[in-house]
Amino acid sequence: MENVKYDKKYFEQRRAELKNIFDQIKPDLQDLADYFAPNAVRFIARNINKPHVKSKKILDSTTFIAVRNFASGMMTGATSPTRRWFKTGIMNRDNKKNKMSYAAKLWCSNQAELSRKILYASNFYQLLPEVYEQLGVFLFSCMTMEKDYDNVANFKVLPIGSYYYSKDGRGVVDTVCRNYMESAKNLVERYGLENCSDAVQQVYKARPNDMFEIVHFVEPNREYKEGSPISAQKKFISVTYEVGNGTTSFLKKAGFDKFPYVVFEASCNGEDAYPSKGCGIYALPDAKQLMSMIKELGKAVKKMVSPAYQGSASLKNKRLSDNPGFFNEDGDSGAGIRPIHEVNPQVLDLKNIIAELRENIKSIFYNDLFAMILNTAERGRTATEVNELKEEKLVLLSPLLEQIHTALKQILDWLFNTEMEAGILPEVPQELEGEEIEIEFISTLAQAMKAQNISSMERFITFTANMAQAVDPVLIKKIKGEKMIDDYADFANIDPNQIAPNEELEALRQQQAEKQAQAEQMQQLQAGSE
């Protein structure tokens, strides 16, 4: 393993490298912010507690509405706090998932319920809309994951531009450099007075709310030793330090077994560090054209309502008015007063173009898809019916949803590890010891994409029953009833607590067989006595 001196100079060099890469996309991010989210970027850490940015380029609320609806749709469709949107299983090796005992399935259900309760008690759901807004506009968003004494877990969403990241050879984010501001009071309380710079110590008592720029850097540890309890030998190295202030030491140097950041991303182009394919980029040309058309419409209406006038030179110094009943003396010319331009702007055509651009922007942010799902849900339709109505639209959403699921899996994996360290997991059945946990998503959107499996099963059962009735009754035995019911329950997201285990069914069959045997024996005895 290559020896590396993990000092402040090393991490400042790494920060500069990551910043150079990020600076290449910075103009694009600013362009997106100007039209969709003016207050979402913070390229300079010290730009905090500033007045809200008012973009002069936004002349219509369509972009705001499209982004808001996208975030709301993702919350409702993918991660609604009011429904079970994920469940826990065991990694599907050699079809092992389908061979789990009832006790194992019940443990998985209880573990997933524990994770849901922790997420609900934390600030996770309050922050997710902001994550989805950033993801929709800028194509990526970053969230921190921290252990919390009161709620087990705590999360933060970072402003766009306040951090840089890089990936490993598999395309997985494994390095994050975050720049942020912290008050002297918070620095002393968190890291101790003796670990802070002289500048912090000098203002701590007199001006505790003075802000200082801080860097938090996490990357793979080149001194990593698997299973080591020593912080310096954990899988990821973590350092926190002040920018400048003449210090060479760290506020804190630690290590993590699990990466403490999760990055939500849209699609990347090859080996690019940052994504370049997503809603914001696709909708930007329409947004620019929309604002231009809004401006032209305003000019046209203004010329019609309040045009510039022309008249005789003799009227120059006379008082004129367009008030009702007022008499304007025309002089000798008889030409009167009339608009300079006798034009009829094509206002209707402009309005049609504007309406089309608005719909394009909303469609790019999947507003029509989410509206369809919510409207059909209100009429009591199931995810299966939604899928039958607009299956092609769900297919369009599928790539982005898979990217979101990848990030959510990382959060749930980190949360499982935190539960295990805190000792609050349910007692693990012996058959699951050493097995790898698998997360399956069962949200409205995920279920809609899986609904075709349920339809296929129902058609197969109907077909087999008809064949058995028409051709040979023995054909009904082709259906493995218990397996079909278990699979149906899995696809339909039925709680295992609501399903009797196969062991109980086997016991019932045994009881029925014994009763039938006893009845037959009694009949034989009665027949013999006669």
Regions found by a protein language model. Give the residues of each.
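Extended, helix-rich architectural segments
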Residues: 1-202
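C-terminal anchoring/interaction modules
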Residues: 1-24, 28, 306-530
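Structured, contiguous alpha/beta core segments that scaffold functional sites
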Residues: 10-12, 16, 23, 147-323
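Short, Φ-rich (hydrophobic/aromatic) sequence segments
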Residues: 62, 66-78, 111, 115, ...
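Alpha-helix initiation and N-capping motif
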Residues: 112, 124, 184, 287, ...
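Short, well-structured alpha-helical interface segments that form or flank functional binding sites
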Residues: 138, 285, 352, 356
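Residues in well-ordered beta-strands of folded domains
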Residues: 144, 164, 240, 438-442, ...
